Amino acid sequence: MAEGETESPRPKKCGPYISSVTSQSVNVVIRGVVLFFIGVFLALVLNLLQIQRNVTLFPPDVITSIFSSAWWVPPCCGTASAVIGLLYPCIDRHLGEPHKFKREWSSVMRCVAVFVGINHASAKVDFDNNFQFSLTLAALSVGLWWTFDRSRSGFGLGVGIAFLATVVTQLLVYNGVYQYTSPDFLYVRSWLPCIFFAGGITMGNIGRQLAMYECKVIAEKSHQE
């Protein structure tokens, strides 16, 4: 190359650490948005199932009236779903125990189907008493965890989510923020913890699968570079 010629300036590349952090942050935001909309969708679907039994977490006209007293329930469910879905893989990494049991999308879809089925059963099946109903739902919820999760961290988080969500829900009801459309409050209270537990396991599985897919994409990009 002649001395008079000058090299054209090349675009500066970010360091690998900055690039990695930026990529991870964007991926976390994308996963959070996806989980949020999944949570909103499931909240609306499950509410339609519960309408069959006249037991809903928000009035049936919530979509038609933006001034409904519980219009905020679906967004809250979406936010909780995003937090849970991001928390599960984070806890797995923190404990150094990556979840590898049934890590494919077909298993996740079956988990979602079983979760919806449990909710459908709670709306359709009649039991002699609330204790029998609660025991059946508890067995189904634990069966969902055993079939699609089997991790100690998943079970512990599921129990914690069920307890916290049930307490928050009852506090909102007691304070008159919103109320159930069914007069049988004991019936509602009997299935809430089981549904919250199964919902936590389901969203945790979705979050883990999204995180694993993200890791695969990042690994493929690093190999190409």
Swiss-Prot record:
Cytoplasmic side: 1-28, 89-103, 149-153, 208-225
The record's account of how the chain is modified after translation: Phosphorylation at Ser-151 by PCK1 reduces binding to oxysterol, disrupting the interaction between INSIG2 and SCAP, thereby promoting nuclear translocation of SREBP proteins (SREBF1/SREBP1 or SREBF2/SREBP2) and subsequent transcription of downstream lipogenesis-related genes.
GO cellular component: SREBP-SCAP-Insig complex
Expression induction or repression: Up-regulated in differentiating preadipocytes.
GO biological-process terms attached to the record: cholesterol biosynthetic process; cholesterol metabolic process; cranial suture morphogenesis; inner ear morphogenesis; middle ear morphogenesis; negative regulation of fatty acid biosynthetic process; negative regulation of steroid biosynthetic process; response to fatty acid
Residues spanned by motif KxHxx: 219-225
Cross-referenced Pfam families: INSIG (PF07281)
Single GO molecular function: protein sequestering activity
Topology Lumenal: residue spans: 52-70, 127-129, 176-189
Placement of covalent cross-link Glycyl cysteine thioester (Cys-Gly) (interchain with G-Cter in ubiquitin): C215
Membrane topology (UniProt): Multi-pass membrane protein
Residue list for modification Cysteine sulfenic acid (-SOH): C215
Reported consequences of knocking out the gene: Knockout mice with a conditional deletion of Insig1 in the liver and a germline deletion of Insig2 overaccumulate cholesterol and triglycerides in liver: despite this accumulation, levels of nuclear sterol regulatory element-binding proteins (SREBPs) are not reduced. The amount of HMGCR is also elevated, caused by impaired degradation of the enzyme. Knockout mice with a germline deletion of both Insig1 and Insig2 die within one day of birth.
Family: Belongs to the INSIG family.
PANTHER family: INSULIN-INDUCED GENE 1 (PTHR15301), INSULIN-INDUCED GENE 2 PROTEIN (PTHR15301:SF10)
Entry comment, domain topic: Binds oxysterols in a pocket within their transmembrane domains and interacts with SCAP via transmembrane domains 3 and 4.
Official protein name in the record: Insulin-induced gene 2 protein
Gene: Insig2
